[in-house]
Amino acid sequence: MAESRTSADGGMETSYGFREVADGEKQGLVNEVFHKVAKRYDIMNDVMSMGLHRAWKDAMISALNPRKDPSYKVLDVAGGTGDIAFRIVEASNRLAHATVLDINGSMLGVGAERAAKKKLTDNLTFVEANAEELPFEPNSFDAYTIAFGIRNVPRIDVALKEAYRVLKRGGRLLVLEFSEVDLPLLDRVYEAWSFNAIPQFGKAITGDAEPYQYLVESIRKFPNQQDFATMIREAGFSRVNFTNYTGGIAALHSGWKL
């Protein structure tokens, strides 16, 4: 579970991959990972998901079914490169507005460049901020999305409570994340791929295997589907459920602020 715990000396610790680090240290370590991979982030997702992340993201947008309405506002957290936000805007016939929030300026820079090339800048706002301290008023958004980002947040419970706070009544939370594989044979194959192939592919692509090693380890430390659903309920959300993709390699969690 990626939650804060009390260390032997009384300080607060959390997981950074398979390591335990001080609560205040994790964010800096995660930031460094994403500074290194920002320009190759989509390639990274292809490597980590064997290309399946594209289908999973399409399914996420279908589940969201964004309104074709200029008043419809979505907050996409940890969405720096814009992949989810672009899909949301396009699915709304370029009518909805998406705020892309990320704590990493390098990721946001990539997203802003891509948005300009796609001529989507009128539908997007890019904000550099922390998921645990959202710079928005309560009841500001119709939907909150986060894809492959929640496991990198030091205090997931705090981020979920912030999501609840900024959503309007009737607003929806959607979290797409790598999860616990529920088919034993697939689990063995995916584990071998994750711990052997992914870091080596990462080194070949970026010249550095370490960021990919962390990302693989962070998947294993993330709560399983049922435990994460419980965390979402504890943050205040109703009608919480999840859908497994590809045998549980990824899962889409949904909750509503009612």
UniProtKB/Swiss-Prot annotation:
One of its GO terms (molecular function) is 2-methoxy-6-polyprenyl-1,4-benzoquinol methyltransferase activity. InterPro entries: SAM-dependent_MTases_sf, UbiE/COQ5_MeTrFase, UbiE/COQ5_MeTrFase_CS. GO terms for biological process: aerobic respiration; menaquinone biosynthetic process; methylation. S-adenosyl-L-methionine binds at residues 81, 102, 130-131. It catalyses: a 2-demethylmenaquinol + S-adenosyl-L-methionine = a menaquinol + S-adenosyl-L-homocysteine + H(+); a 2-methoxy-6-(all-trans-polyprenyl)benzene-1,4-diol + S-adenosyl-L-methionine = a 5-methoxy-2-methyl-3-(all-trans-polyprenyl)benzene-1,4-diol + S-adenosyl-L-homocysteine + H(+). Its EC number is 2.1.1.163, 2.1.1.201. SUPFAM superfamilies: S-adenosyl-L-methionine-dependent methyltransferases. Keywords: Menaquinone biosynthesis, Methyltransferase, S-adenosyl-L-methionine, Transferase, Ubiquinone biosynthesis. CDD domains: AdoMet_MTases. Pfam families: Ubie_methyltran. Pathway: Quinol/quinone metabolism; menaquinone biosynthesis; menaquinol from 1,4-dihydroxy-2-naphthoate: step 2/2; Cofactor biosynthesis; ubiquinone biosynthesis. HAMAP family: MenG_UbiE_methyltr. Belongs to the class I-like SAM-binding methyltransferase superfamily. MenG/UbiE family. Methyltransferase required for the conversion of demethylmenaquinol (DMKH2) to menaquinol (MKH2) and the conversion of 2-polyprenyl-6-methoxy-1,4-benzoquinol (DDMQH2) to 2-polyprenyl-3-methyl-6-methoxy-1,4-benzoquinol (DMQH2). This is Ubiquinone/menaquinone biosynthesis C-methyltransferase UbiE. It comes from Rhizobium rhizogenes (strain K84 / ATCC BAA-868) (Agrobacterium radiobacter). The lineage of its organism: Bacteria, Pseudomonadati, Pseudomonadota, Alphaproteobacteria, Hyphomicrobiales.
